[in-house]
Structure formats: C-alpha cells, structure tokens
C-alpha cells in the first residue's frame, strides 16, 4: 500500500472518530429533550403532533411501541407501491415514464421501507422525479428514523427501572427526522451541489458528442430474432452515435439522506459511480463519511444516555477493531490485482481497476465498499461484482456478520447490543453466575429474543440461496457460470437478508422470482429483528437495577472488547464460511491455478 493510500484511510478514520463525540452528545440531548434545537423547534414539534393527533406525553409499552413501528412501516410500503403503480398519471414525470411492473414495485416498496434500498431497476430509466422524491426520499428519512427510534427504546430499557413503558414511538421518530436527519441532510446536500451533484426538475437533455462513436449490433428480423448468414454467424450492422442523453433530476437531496440514513439507493442506476451523483474526490469523501458518521456517533449517544460513556466507547472500539483489518484486506487484494494474472506471469502493476472509476482509484473504491457493507448502506462507487474473489468476499462477509460493524443508523447498534448481551451470557456461563449487563440481569427470556435476532438473517440468506440454486427461476438469472455465479446469488441474499442493498450486479435480479424472494427476505430480516429487540427492551425496563459486585463482568474494559469481537466473528464464521467456501474462496483458488 502506498503512503498516499494509507494517508487517505487514516484521514477518513480520523475525521469519522473525531465526529463521534460531538454528534453523539447532540443526539443524546435531542432524545432526552435537552438540546437547544428541541427548545427552538418546540412549536414545530407541537404543530406536527397536533395535526397528526399525537399525544407526546403518552408513554408506550413495548407492544404498543412495536405496533406503531410496524403499522407505520406497512403504510410506507403501501404508499410507495401505489406511487410506483400510478406514476404514469402523476405530475413531475418529464420523461413520461410508465407505471412500474407489479413485482418490481413490490420489491422496491419493501426495499425502501426496510432501509435496505435494494434496486433491481435502473433509477433514471424507471422512476419519475415525483416517485424518487415523494416515495423513495421520504422513505429514506422515515426508515432511518424508525431504526433510530427502536435503538432509543432499547437504551431506555437499560436505563429505566421497574418501568413498563419505553417512551413514545411518534416522538422519537419526529425528533430523529426534525432535529438530526433533516439538518444534516440539508447541509450535506448544499455541499454536494457545490461539488456539482445535480439538483433540478428539468427533463433529460440530449447533447451532441464532440466526436461521434460507432459500434456493430446484431440485426434482427421482424419477429425480433437475430439474423445469421449461411455459415451461422450473426449478421451485424454498423451504428453511429452522435448524441447522448444526459439524465437529470433532484439527485443531491436524495443522495444526502441515502448516505446519512444508511439507505444507499441511488438516484442513478450506477449509484455513486455516476458523475452526476458523485463528481469529485471531495464529494466522494463527504459521501463516504456520511455512511458511517451517525452509526459511529450513536455509540457515544448510547454511553451518554446510560450514564457511562465508557460503554459507548467500548462498542465503538469493537466495531472499529473489526472494520479496520477487513478494510486493509480489501485494499491489498484489489491492489494485488487478479490472481490469475500472477499465475500466468503477468504483472498487474495497476492493481484490479476493473469496475472502478479512475477519479477515485483503488483505495477509495475499496474503502467505500468496506464502509457501505459494514453499515447497512449498500451504495457503491465501484462495481463489487468486478472485485477480486477475496476483495469481494470481505464486503459479503461484513453483511453476513449481521450489519453490526457500525451497521445501519439505529439498527447497527441495537444489533451489536444484542451481541453484547450474548457475550455477557457466555461469560456468565464460564464463571457460573447469572450474567448482568449495565445493571440488568440477562435471563432466559432475553436470550431467547437474542437468539431470534441472531438466527433470522442467516435463515433468510442461506435458505434463500438454497432455494435459488435449486430452482430454474433462480438459476436462469445467472450469466456467470461456476463459483462466481453462486457468489452472485449468495451476495444478493446476504444483502437483502441483512438490509444492505448492494449487489454483485451480474445477477439479473429484476425478475418475478428474485423480486418476490428478496422482498420477503428484506421484510422478515427487518421486522423479525426489530420486534424481538423491543421485547428485550420491555423486559429490561421492568427489571430493577443490580449493583455491580465482585463477580460482575466489567463491560468497559479492553477484555470485553475482545470478547465482543470474538462472539461476533465466531458466529459469523461458523454460519457462513461453508457457503463462502463454495463461492469466493474456491473462485480464488481456481484463479491461482489459472483455470
């Protein structure tokens, strides 16, 4: 690795970690009602509650909190589905795009409501400006805020004693949007517009190329069948292209929240590899920073709200300790180039630049890929399908760990806290003592709920992959034979089953089979995790505080960091290494053998 590349990585991590404390403290003040913005915008909050009929003083039990969360998200799914199906009749559709097909609309609606943002369609070719703004961008805000609300409820479960309520979902949702996501998104959008990210309602523009280009395409008969000559070779015709269509739209406003809310769904088909969505190295840095900044800062928010900031730093340290080594593995694998070249005696001096933008290079592409899959973001500035086998394995495995290495805003931290509960339970088994975490006893009920949280994503990933490779409907979308084709299917279900949204794009996923299967995987992986987390929160809130004793495991020490990292990695390794061995690992071995 070059000194320049190392400097870029250190600069990114330095800024990210430096922002964790101030932003985390601010978010804690927002949720506790201490922030100056809460006082300044109190009239706006009251107006929102009044027109929606919400009593902000009404507290909810965990069941009521979960019901509000589920109903709100279900209404979001229905709204986005209806908007896509009716977009041909609605305004702000300068290209006259027709309604989205039912299966694709179903998949997209669930995808954005669950904070996954899996995209089987091409954004600028499928969705109108209105659908992008009113449907997808709104869901980017509310799905992120929903995850943050669930996290806040879990934190209150640790803080409260002998209580049967966890707060008010509608208040937590409103404050997440009004005081955190909206201001940050507005600031980031302005910075991105300054860098050249487009923000307009104008229709697409046709421009004349400086130099015309041409290509040969197969000729077809009236029935659309390819023509062949007497020898069976395809008959082609030369086509000259002198114009290009430039897709435009309100991209900057959507890009800002798609990054900050760990949503990831791009305005354009190639996401942040598109120059209108990510034109400069500085815009690239800002968008990469936005992927992890809220998730990292929420660790400090957690520490502040539980009254011991060391607890938050321990969680952040565990996340960083997993993230950094895997980042270096990705960078080194991509800089090493295709292993098949080395086996053939070819010197890949420039590394593996396939599928990458030259304006970003290998380090920034690998850093983005690692960050976007450590978080449940899924946006890309390079094509993961073109990474080397081991370079692509790291993003896949980061998703398979459960999106707890930073993870989604809210969902990443509550997932890691579930692993922390498992870690103290394991430690309690070793010393024969009832485990405790933050002064609350961890008993059978909490462990049952934690088991559901940990087991549902692997069930979606491995079960979905197994079904896809057994059925013709699943195999027909694979155009790369062998191990890489299997990797594409495994990556798709790893992404959907962990609410990430990125893809090995060589898989033709916009089919009824994949739209249905991946849609169900996204739905269950989001809500079968959030509801058990709220159940844990309710159980913990009802318990009394247990003062730490001589046998209590300290959870603010480097030893606990190591224990937590070990639990996360062991669970991930035992669950997915056999499947990874059939995909990227065997593909790497085949490339070494140059076969």
UniProtKB/Swiss-Prot annotation:
Signal peptide, first to last residue: none
InterPro entries in the record: KdpA
One protein family per Pfam: KdpA
Keywords attached to this entry: Cell inner membrane, Cell membrane, Ion transport, Membrane, Potassium, Potassium transport, Transmembrane, Transmembrane helix, Transport
Keyword Membrane: yes
Keyword set includes Cell membrane: yes
Subcellular location: Cell inner membrane
Topology of this chain in the membrane: Multi-pass membrane protein
Main location group: membrane
Gene Ontology MF terms in the entry: P-type potassium transmembrane transporter activity; potassium ion binding
Residues that span the membrane, as ranges: 9-29, 63-83, 135-155, 177-197, 285-305, 312-332, 412-432, 451-471, 516-536, 560-580
A cellular-component GO term for this protein: plasma membrane
PANTHER family the UniProt entry points to: POTASSIUM-TRANSPORTING ATPASE A CHAIN, POTASSIUM-TRANSPORTING ATPASE POTASSIUM-BINDING SUBUNIT
Subunit field text: The system is composed of three essential subunits: KdpA, KdpB and KdpC.
Family to which the UniProt record says this protein belongs: Belongs to the KdpA family.
Function: Part of the high-affinity ATP-driven potassium transport (or Kdp) system, which catalyzes the hydrolysis of ATP coupled with the electrogenic transport of potassium into the cytoplasm. This subunit binds the periplasmic potassium ions and delivers the ions to the membrane domain of KdpB through an intramembrane tunnel.
Protein name from the UniProt record: Potassium-transporting ATPase potassium-binding subunit
Source organism (scientific name): Methylococcus capsulatus (strain ATCC 33009 / NCIMB 11132 / Bath)
Lineage: Bacteria, Pseudomonadati, Pseudomonadota, Gammaproteobacteria, Methylococcales
């Amino acid at each position: 690795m070059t000194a320049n590349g190392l400097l870029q990585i250190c600069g990114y991590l330095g800024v990210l970690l430096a922002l964790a404390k101030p932003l985390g403290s601010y978010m804690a003040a927002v949720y506790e009602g201490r922030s100056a913005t809460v006082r300044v915008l109190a009239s706006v909050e009251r107006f929102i509650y009044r027109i929606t009929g919400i009593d902000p003083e009404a507290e909810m039990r965990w069941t009521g909190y979960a019901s509000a969360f589920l109903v709100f998200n279900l209404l979001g799914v229905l709204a986005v589905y209806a908007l896509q199906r009716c977009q041909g009749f609605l305004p702000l559709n300068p290209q006259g795009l027709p309604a989205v097909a039912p299966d694709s609309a179903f998949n997209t609606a669930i995808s954005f409501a669950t904070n996954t943002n899996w995209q089987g369609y091409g954004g600028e070719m499928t969705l109108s400006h209105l659908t992008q703004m009113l449907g997808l961008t709104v869901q980017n805000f509310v799905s992120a805020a929903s995850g943050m609300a669930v996290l806040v409820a879990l934190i209150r479960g640790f803080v409260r004693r002998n209580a049967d309520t966890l707060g008010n979902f509608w208040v937590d949702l409103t404050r997440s949007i009004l005081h955190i996501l909206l201001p940050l998104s507005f600031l980031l959008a302005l910075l991105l517009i300054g860098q050249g990210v487009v923000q307009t309602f104008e229709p697409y523009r046709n421009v004349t190329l400086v130099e015309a280009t041409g290509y040969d395409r197969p000729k077809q008969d009236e029935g659309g069948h390819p023509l062949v000559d007497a020898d069976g070779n395809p008959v082609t015709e030369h086509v000259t292209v002198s114009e290009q269509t430039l897709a435009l739209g309100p991209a900057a406003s959507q890009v800002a929240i798609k990054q900050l809310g760990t949503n990831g769904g791009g305005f354009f088909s190639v996401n942040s590899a598109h120059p209108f969505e990510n034109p400069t190295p500085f815009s690239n840095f800002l968008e990469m920073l936005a992927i992890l900044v809220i998730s990292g800062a929420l660790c400090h928010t957690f520490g502040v709200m539980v009254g011991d900031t060391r607890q938050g730093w321990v969680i952040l340290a565990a996340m960083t300790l997993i993230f950094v080594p895997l980042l270096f593995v990705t960078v080194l694998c991509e800089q090493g180039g295709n292993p098949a070249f080395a086996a053939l005696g070819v010197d890949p001096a420039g590394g593996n630049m396939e599928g990458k933008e030259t304006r970003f290079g290998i380090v920034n592409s690998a850093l983005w890929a690692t960050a976007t899959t450590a978080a449940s973001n899924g946006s890309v500035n390079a094509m993961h399908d073109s990474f080397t086998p081991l370079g692509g394995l790291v993003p896949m495995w980061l998703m398979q760990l459960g999106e707890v290495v930073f993870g989604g805003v809210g969902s990443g931290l509550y997932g890691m806290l579930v692993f922390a509960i498992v870690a103290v339970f394991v430690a309690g088994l070793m010393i024969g003592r009832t485990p405790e975490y933050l002064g609350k006893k961890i008993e059978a009920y909490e462990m049952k709920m934690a088991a559901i949280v940990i087991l549902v994503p692997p069930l979606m990933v491995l079960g979905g992959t197994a079904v896809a490779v057994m059925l013709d409907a699943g195999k027909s979308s694979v155009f790369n034979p062998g191990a890489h084709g299997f990797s594409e299917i495994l990556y798709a279900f790893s992404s959907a089953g962990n609410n990430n949204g990125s893809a090995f794009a060589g898989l033709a996923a916009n089919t009824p089979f994949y739209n249905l299967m991946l849609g169900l995987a996204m739905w269950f992986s989001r809500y079968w995790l959030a509801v058990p987390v709220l159940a844990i929160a309710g159980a913990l809130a009802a318990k009394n505080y247990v003062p730490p004793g001589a046998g209590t495991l300290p959870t603010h020490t480097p030893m606990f960091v190591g224990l937590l990292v070990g639990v996360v990695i062991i669970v991930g390794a035992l669950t997915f290494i056999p499947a990874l061995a059939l995909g990227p690992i065997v593909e790497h071995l085949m490339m070494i053998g140059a076969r």
